[in-house]
Amino acid sequence: MTEEGYPLEAIILVTTKLGELWKVAEEAKKIEGVQFAKPVAGRFDVVVHAKTNRLSWVIARIHSIKGVANTESLITLEAKFE
């Protein structure tokens, strides 16, 4: 569980259809649990940061946005050093 009380924190990398990255980023920001969604340059078109206990639901909502082609999710890990 993260410090804020959410079970999962993830980075979701989104590939969009041509010309859709700005719209996809704006729509992704509206999803509950999304901390930010920003267009990026590189292999992916949008990076989404989410803190949620319903990651599958967040990913499904992202996929429901018109213009989304694919996603790849990275679950953050917490390392504890003593």
Model-derived regions, located:
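A compositional/biophysical signature of low hydrophobicity enriched in polar/charged and small residues
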Residues: 1-82
